[in-house]
């Protein structure tokens, strides 16, 4: 697989795909195979390859992932940890949980801190790929199946308000056409200063975009980056 330096990329139009470092060899041989993610069963109807467009799309999907981790943590503590309950009781618990999550009742210090720690490990174990795909392989106005599956209020909460359409894909959460993968020759691994971890790529992109626009704000990513940068400062000391 070819590598490309982050500073060579178009900050507005590059297509970024995240994947586990463990997948590098397989992707180098076979490209990206479309799939339905573990967290999308029952939501996505067809297999796809997901990606984010541009640096802002990259940062927004990271922000949304932190929120998703908060959701997962809260769901376990509110519903999934209870094993000896009936199906009806579990459904009622989950219904109440989703209502409360939509209303923002689970953004506690403990949940946010846990999600930040989870996100750090996730980003350390991932790499970032640049996809050289064309309109033959994706539709910028394709349907976001998660939006059509969920209530608008819940989707808006999960996407942190980064919504421009009620049913179309957003720049931070785009995908290939159904059943379409990405050929290995259209994939490059992104590096910065010879470092390929997604966390290092995130640091550079975040700094670059903040330098351009100091008023740029994120729901959870700002706090995440403050924590990561403070860890880096402590290491230097």
Each predicted region: which residue ranges?
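Short, well-ordered alpha-helical scaffold segment located
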Residues: 56-57, 114
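Active-site and NAD+-binding cores of ADP-ribose-processing enzymes
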Residues: 73, 77-237
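ADP-ribose/NAD+-binding catalytic cleft of ART/PARP-like enzymes
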Residues: 1-50, 57-103
């Amino acid at each position: 697989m070819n590598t490309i330096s982050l500073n060579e990329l178009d900050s507005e139009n590059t297509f970024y795909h995240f994947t586990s470092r463990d997948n590098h060899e397989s992707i180098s041989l076979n490209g990206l195979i479309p799939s339905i993610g573990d967290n999308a069963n029952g939501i996505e109807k067809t297999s796809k390859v997901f990606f984010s467009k541009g640096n802002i799309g990259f940062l927004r999907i990271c922000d949304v992932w932190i929120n998703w981790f908060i959701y997962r943590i809260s769901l376990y503590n509110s519903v999934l940890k209870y094993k000896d309950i009936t199906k009806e009781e579990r459904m009622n618990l989950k219904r109440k949980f989703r209502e409360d999550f939509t209303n923002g009742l689970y953004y506690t210090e403990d949940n946010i801190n846990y999600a930040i720690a989870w996100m750090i490990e996730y980003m350390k174990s991932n790499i970032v790929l640049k996809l050289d795909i064309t309109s033959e392989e994706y539709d910028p106005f394709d349907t976001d199946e998660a939006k059509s599956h969920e209530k608008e209020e819940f989707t808006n909460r999960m996407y942190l308000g980064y919504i421009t359409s009620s049913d179309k894909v957003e720049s931070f959460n785009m995908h290939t056409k159904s059943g379409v993968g990405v050929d290995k020759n259209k994939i490059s691994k992104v590096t910065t200063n010879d470092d390929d971890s997604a966390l290092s790529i995130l640091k550079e992109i975040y700094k670059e975009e903040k330098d351009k626009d100091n008023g740029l704000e994120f729901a959870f990513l700002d706090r995440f980056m403050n924590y990561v940068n403070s860890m880096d400062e402590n290491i230097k000391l």
